[in-house]
Amino acid sequence: MNPLIQSLTEGQLRTDIPSFRPGDTVRVHAKVVEGNRERIQIFEGVVIARKGAGISENYTVRKISNGVGVERIFPIHTPRVEKIEVVRYGKVRRAKLYYLRALQGKAARIKEIRR
């Protein structure tokens, strides 16, 4: 990477992010603007993918809400996310868990690792 770009992005990288991988269940505290108010919205689900590197790294979180699957993509280093909590660690053998989209109920469960 260009040293100039690298030096500019280094100051914007966050250091308060816990280590998590696909298969882990996370609770993301995202800032949402509604009109002139700003509030924190909690989005809890399974990390099904991590993409990119450096400042442009993203992760996808999937949850089931009222029987409908909902996925949100969050940039890791965004100031819009106040904090990320790892609720439980999952044991999976894939980096991308897109196959969970086709599974329902108990079939979509992920085995837990004790850490």
UniProtKB/Swiss-Prot annotation:
Recorded superkingdom: Bacteria
Keyword vocabulary terms for this entry: Ribonucleoprotein, Ribosomal protein
Record's GO cellular component terms: cytosolic large ribosomal subunit
Single GO biological process annotation from the record: translation
Coiled-coil region(s): none
Annotated S-S bridges: none
PANTHER family reported for this sequence: LARGE RIBOSOMAL SUBUNIT PROTEIN BL19M, RIBOSOMAL PROTEIN L19
Function per UniProt: This protein is located at the 30S-50S ribosomal subunit interface and may play a role in the structure and function of the aminoacyl-tRNA binding site.
Protein name from the UniProt record: Large ribosomal subunit protein bL19
UniProt organism field: Streptococcus pneumoniae serotype 4 (strain ATCC BAA-334 / TIGR4)
Name of the gene encoding the protein in the UniProt record: rplS
